Amino acid sequence: MKLKALSVAVTVALTSFTALAADEQETVVVIGSALDQLVQTEINSDTLEKKQASDIKDVLNTMPSVTVDGNARYSRKVYVRGMEDKFAVVTIDGARQEGQLFHHSGDQAIDPAMLKRAEIELGGNSALSGSGAINGSFSYETKDPSDLLKPGESIGARVKTSYQTAYERFATNVAVYAKVNDKLQFMGIANYSEDGDLHIPDQEAVTSKQGELKSGVAKVVFIPNDANEFKLTFNRYNDGGKRQLSGEKAGALYADDEHNYHSLNRDTVTLQHEYDAGSDLVHLKTNIYYNRQYMERDVLVDTAWDKDANGKWIKDGTIAIPDREYNVTTIGGDIRNISWVGEHELTYGLDGYKAEQWIDAGDGVYQSGSKQGETKKYGMDGGTVTAYGLYLQDMYEFSDFRLTTGLRYDVHKLGGVYDGDFDQLSPKFKGEYQTTDNLKLRVGYGRLFKGASLPETLTMKAAADVKQSDTKAMTGNNYEAGFDYELTRLLAADYAILGFTAYTYNLDNQMHPTKNNTTLANQYDVEVWGVETVLSYALDSLSVYANHSYSDGDQKDLDNGKTSHMSKTGIHNFKAGFNYSLNSEFVFGWDSRFVPGNDYTDEDGEQVKRAGFATHNIWAAYTPTFAKDLEMNIGVDNILDKKYAEHTGFGISWGSDKYTSYEAGRNFKASIAYNF
């Protein structure tokens, strides 16, 4: 079938910039969109290895319309098209990452050392992205044993060590992998990384954000026959230390404090099955998962607070607080089938999950003050979400058109300390028109729906303290239009493409999880608009990318009806880079960003100014032919030692230099790895 053959060709094209078979004259014929190409060439294990990626900022830093702020690993927050990733669907090996543990920490907890690749969908126009995809979706996939085994190998191991100066980050990585026979493969990867002082230009070293990352993945792949494949994966992420709790705040605020231990953790178990016997009607993919995100905090003696007769907070002695564990678990699954009916590729299925939050802790005891000897409960149960969706997507090609239509029916139910039932039927559409051999026009639409998410876990309230408002679902519309223009012949390149997208979306009854525990209130009606331009180019041993993105937005306060500028928007972002293979042994590259200064008027009428900045990173990788099992990488991030802060960051986004968390300065990094 014409469409099926085209789909296979596009998949091959997106796997690499240029595909060369044993016959050097064979090249890729069909090319995906400019954005797809950028994602697949910049977010894969090989590229991330060469650039020595060590946290989520390194993974996403080349993407248009995506900003990652925060200068410590546990403080990284991700913003997409003007809003936080709380309005995107994030999965790791298909497991949804639900809930917010703490509003001063990030929640995309994945170690690049485990990462194979990612799929990124900007906007909410796909029926396959899952329930609640407003501004996009991030689908991360961990490595397989076959990714590490070399041709002809049945067993292997790899040891790597690295160091980064700006974070005083020392890391060691060990991997073991094996192919028992044609049916069974397994692997294990363990990574240990220790951060010391954080170095920022023109400031004292930050001593309050030190920590240790312990992460790992274990995977078994079972292929009983040509039609079936099973993958069982366990992934753990543990990032902790005696450090300031509020990771996104400036370190100088806590330089002289004594810090207690806390950690941000994730345990994920997934079982994936794929059945494909070559039938046009049955290509079944099933995924079930358990995901637990949790924060651990040690015992401490702290100030006890109470309200006086006027409702003002006052100090009232001290209280001994026990160990606490803040939990969000998500159990769910997705079963989908792909059928070819004539020229139609139909994808349909059912997905669902249940998310639950609670605090596991003993009682605190007042040590002094008016309540001396009394106890305070810290353990409690919170809210639950039960959600499921039915979806259908049809991709159909005729003449010079490709139409992708979809429907999702989502049901979202609140439980535990909250109540609410929400549902919506959401149509989705993507249209492509190949006007010439080079030019493809694109349009898209998605009806948006997101039920009320669980609020922040750290600030949970007991059931007696919850006074829920008339909580509504978040709904809206997403519109997009753009083009992809192939420039391969015009530029005499192996491959070149330019893409442009303009978008606008609105979200009514927007609500953010931060401190929204008592009322679970809807807060704003928002409207965001923006543009994205992406260029990818390859010739011989040279690959180049460049992109620009901009978003702007307004929000209407549902309490007072006042409209104001959205503080995470109004930002131009230019990104560019290249990599060049000097020979079979040596490859080097450069990545650059430029963010112009900007200003806006906040909801109080105050002018907020954000200073512009430019940063440059360089890197190189060396694999000597005399020792092919040896790999060496060097690099320098922020080579000009620029003092800057991401415009979406805490403090700078609302005009406070005191709270602004500036990014790391010049960062020399090096690694060496050996394969056994």
Regions found by a protein language model. Name each.
Residues T161, L281-V301, L441-R442, K472-V531, ...:
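Membrane-embedded beta-barrel scaffold of Gram-negative outer-membrane proteins
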Residues I223-Y237, L264-Y418, Q434, R489-L491, ...:
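Face-selective signature of the C-terminal outer-membrane beta-barrel domain
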Residues A22-G152, E168, G247, T268, ...:
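Acidic, small-polar-rich N-terminal luminal/periplasmic segments of exported/outer-membrane proteins
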Residues A22-D23, S129-G130, P145-I155, D182-K183, ...:
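Short loop/turn motifs that connect adjacent beta-strands in outer-membrane beta-barrel proteins
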Residues S131, A464, V528-W529, I571-F574, ...:
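C-terminal beta-signal and terminal closure region of outer-membrane beta-barrel proteins
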Residues Y396-L403, A492-N506, A521-E603, L640, ...:
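Gram-negative outer-membrane beta-barrel transporters
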Residues N238-K242, S246-A252, G369, K413, ...:
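Surface-exposed extracellular loop regions of Gram-negative outer-membrane beta-barrel proteins
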Residues P145-S146, S154, Y167-A171, A175-L264, ...:
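Periplasmic-side early beta-strands and strand-to-turn transitions of outer-membrane beta-barrels
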